[in-house]
Amino acid sequence: MISLKVCGFIQIWSQKTGMTKLKEALIETVQRQKEIKLVVTFKSGKFIRIFQLSNNIRSVVLRHCKKRQSHLRLTLKNNVFLFIDKLSYRDAKQLNMFLDIIHQNKSQQPMKSDDDWSVFESRNMLKEIDKTSFYSICNKPSYQKMPLFMSKSPTHVKKGILENQGGKGQNTLSSDVQTNEDILKEDNPVPNKKYKTDSLKYIQSNRKNPSSLEDLEKDRDLKLGPSFNTNCNGNPNLDETVLATQTLNAKNGLTSPLEPEHSQGDPRCNKAQVPLDSHSQQLQQGFPNLGNTCYMNAVLQSLFAIPSFADDLLTQGVPWEYIPFEALIMTLTQLLALKDFCSTKIKRELLGNVKKVISAVAEIFSGNMQNDAHEFLGQCLDQLKEDMEKLNATLNTGKECGDENSSPQMHVGSAATKVFVCPVVANFEFELQLSLICKACGHAVLKVEPNNYLSINLHQETKPLPLSIQNSLDLFFKEEELEYNCQMCKQKSCVARHTFSRLSRVLIIHLKRYSFNNAWLLVKNNEQVYIPKSLSLSSYCNESTKPPLPLSSSAPVGKCEVLEVSQEMISEINSPLTPSMKLTSESSDSLVLPVEPDKNADLQRFQRDCGDASQEQHQRDLENGSALESELVHFRDRAIGEKELPVADSLMDQGDISLPVMYEDGGKLISSPDTRLVEVHLQEVPQHPELQKYEKTNTFVEFNFDSVTESTNGFYDCKENRIPEGSQGMAEQLQQCIEESIIDEFLQQAPPPGVRKLDAQEHTEETLNQSTELRLQKADLNHLGALGSDNPGNKNILDAENTRGEAKELTRNVKMGDPLQAYRLISVVSHIGSSPNSGHYISDVYDFQKQAWFTYNDLCVSEISETKMQEARLHSGYIFFYMHNGIFEELLRKAENSRLPSTQAGVIPQGEYEGDSLYRPA
């Protein structure tokens, strides 16, 4: 029996410990009592890990890349996964042959389930290790991304992942909770950039594998032939950090696909069969349709394409032994880790598990009925957040109770107090502040609402100005007069307004394209809505608005902070209302904000903090004419000494969960008991003459709570577009002349041919104007009918007035947009079809690694230019993902630094879809 010894860098994943760091090690094969084991000795020499190979190999995948280095992926049946990187070509080939022989040997003895692997100290064996055999390690090794293809061999992963289903006994999980220092201190696994990389050449020898170990031993001295052929079928895109899927048992797996795979003749998948050689590139692959599950595929592709979201799922070192099989975080992580290199059959299993887990909570997704993508997105985010809260609660309970069986990560260094960041809260959660101010007495109610997305209405404008995401946001944030029962003066007239108190990394905007007609039938609005490349939120923010959580931060967001209200801010709110103001605090019982203080201890405590002012101090302040300032100072001093308010559980936007409710126009504001209210009655503050126009004031009070409450659904029924703030008189006329001259210049220029390459620094005024030119020069939009528009009135050419309106909006985005409050388009989920009861969902996603846009249409993936995407989705765009500019540029820099010098992957050129192929049910 021969013994192989190779040197490389190894990364190990198991269910209980998660993914380790990539570390240098000596890998050796050893035979003991007719059993073959793999011994991994780390360079430190302190620890050795032993893995059973006999009758325990599920798949072996070998990949070669440039510079004669290779990597090998070994998946074991006992839910252990090994990624061996930076192997020499010769070592990788020999190790692959060795493992293939063991895998195909049918005369092996059954594997001992209790001998999965062990970790033990081996200080005495340190002398036996040849230190000169290790590679030299750089201080910061460059971890290369490599394409992961699935072999067509029936012995590979495509087969192995299903072996434990259908009544077969489950393998005993390996006892991975050990005292291995290399595992216990893995709080910072290899950074997972979750970028799709440029594909590399997959080289596989066409020589036959040796039929015995003796043949392999003889073959070690033979020179490998120079001729290689590709024999693979998979995706050239992958993740840096790789997790292996757990055993999919019968209770968790979906063994019968609901819909056959697309055939080559399917008009929804115009994918040509191209012969591959050693230099060819594999076409990207999306997700298979399980039967009307295009809504799920489109949403998941958009989520997985956000690098920060993928990092938070994969690289936190989550103790998987605390996560049940039916948890959404488990199934999503498996799908995210394997989607770029596993077979379509395995993708079906993983997608089926995601659907099954979500259906267990939301029964509406359990069958084969068509569902709404926004409903699925909301349920997915809500359920994932709940899983993370349960995980942190479980770990905290185990730590407080001194549970001996708790995860070893809880007892090593800073991990004992570690709180795992929720990917939903860190990436999508923002805070809106609602202000309700009585017009008669100035009594103000302030409410902070954490949300994961904004649902905005499609307003029918009387102006000929074209609709866009930007001006729809303007209408959403426009001040509105409402009937509201004031608790102080009993009047019913108030002014309501929303502003951002905390921004998110990614802003999700849901466009309500569905509503009820006069016959109370649900219909779709195919009206054209322009999709800007950039959004400016500066009009909806103030100086107290908090920026998104930085990428480098792992601290939980949403910590309760001291409420600080300045006299200037309060004056700005109430300046047009009354010259006599006084600060008080009490509960709210309005029709608009039904909150019961006796059922919410947190709210009562918050109100007590605001209202327990000293009567003596209050009287002195009234005599000195400074009641407002004194009350605020007194409140701040009391609040500093208080502990943080406990975080309360909350709900998603329940007003947007089903189709009939979700597309309601003009819905009323819904609040939950977790919402904190502050009522302010202001008095005796001089009124500034410049603050007479109430609609020009900004937000004023800032809260920051770690919870998700119900978002405002259809709060405004605006009748006109808000005019951007600006100077008057000559300055305004000059601005208009400049804008018109720019527009005229645009209309005289011809559109540039070809696909425009994305520039990482395209955030200046000049670049945005060029982007405007590219979009507005596409005057002939007749082809939009084939791309999803069923409204004949929307197929004509944009007139000059609409063109000028779009250009003015973009100019406003440039000149009014604060870089700290600007957002960049990264994904669009579209519904192709004229009816809410039929149609098809697709997603357009920006690839940070390739710096290009791709359309995901179930299994089909094709490249598309950003300009063409914006035009094609004018009538069908449904959910929009915008990323904060600072986060976008940082992720782009990381992607550029990690890119490999290889050619771009071959993809299907984006073309117009045939006829009504996209109108078929998902």
Swiss-Prot record:
Catalyzed reaction equations: Thiol-dependent hydrolysis of ester, thioester, amide, peptide and isopeptide bonds formed by the C-terminal Gly of ubiquitin (a 76-residue protein attached to proteins as an intracellular targeting signal)
Regions of compositional bias (Polar residues) in chain numbering: 170-181
Stretches assigned to the USP domain: 285-885
CDD domains: Peptidase_C19, PH_USP37_like
Pfam families the record matches: UCH, UCH_N
GO molecular function: cysteine-type deubiquitinase activity; cysteine-type endopeptidase activity
Domain of life: Eukaryota
Protein function: Deubiquitinase involved in innate antiviral immunity by mediating 'Lys-48'-linked deubiquitination of CGAS, thereby promoting its stabilization.
Protein known as: Ubiquitin carboxyl-terminal hydrolase 29
Biological source species: Homo sapiens
